[in-house]
Amino acid sequence: MPQNLAVVIERPDLYTITCNGQTVKAKRNDWWLDKAFGRIGIASVARAGENVVTIKAAPFTMFHELEPAYVLGDFTLKPAEKGFVITPGHALTLGAASQATSPSGCAGWNLQGHPFYSAGVSYRERFDVAKPAGRFIVALPNWYGSVAKVAVNGKPAGFIDAPPWECDVTQYVKRGQNEVEITVIGTLKNTLGPHHGKPALGAAWPASFHQGPNPGPPPGDSYSAVAYGLFEPFVLKQAVK
């Protein structure tokens, strides 16, 4: 059971919340994404198998707008007949072109147990530099995300957000071994949706969220998620005049 397992409820102060019949509450100033999204730890009351989170409002008023609940923690998701099953976490790797594809043409985090993940995933490589002369460029040959952060030897070196998908890191490179870290950032599309009705990538209107499966959650494999990630090793290029 992940020790950081939590459920996020919008405006938790308006409800009585239980997990498996045990009362749980959001701690003050413990929120996620938005200050109205209270993070509620449930590791102490969760169990293997089915878990039920219940929210009650009495009386129910115009301020009680029901919104999705989000489950957070160190775990992965396995597609099931209805939605997903939480399974032990594992490290993400380079996407494989042989798997199901998305805009990048390769498999991303969504097919590695993280279909709703939107934050950053870091990839590291070490490069030996015999002679630090000329310019050094970090290049991403195949990736998909909103932006990629670049760090060299533990120091922030810049961002990659537009073609030709390169970042000049000359001033951070030293003679000998250099560690380069690329952090690919996704977007909130996979987290917030829309997840149903095969929405077009790049479009999200109020009506997009009005479409839902009937009855109940569809198979996990049918959820709409973008394949973010790194699909080929990044490279450190040296340009000498």
Residue ranges and their predicted role:
Residues 36-52, 58, 167-177, 188, ...:
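Short, surface-exposed tryptophan/glycine-enriched loops
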Residues 1-19, 53, 127-153, 180-184:
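Aromatic-lined ligand-binding clefts that engage carbohydrates, nucleic acids, or primary amines
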Residues 122-128, 233-237, 241:
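Mature extracytoplasmic enzyme cores
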Residues 17-39, 150-166:
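Solvent-exposed beta-strand/loop surfaces of large extracellular or lumenal domains
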Residues 58-85, 186-238:
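Glycine/proline-rich low-complexity spacer/linker segments in large multi-domain proteins
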Residues 38-40, 117-129, 165-166:
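Short beta-strands within extracellular/lumenal beta-sheet-rich domains
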Residues 87-126:
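Edge strands and adjacent loops of beta-rich recognition modules
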Residues 1-2, 10, 33-35, 46-48, ...:
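Surface-exposed coil/turn segments at beta-strand junctions on protein surfaces, enriched
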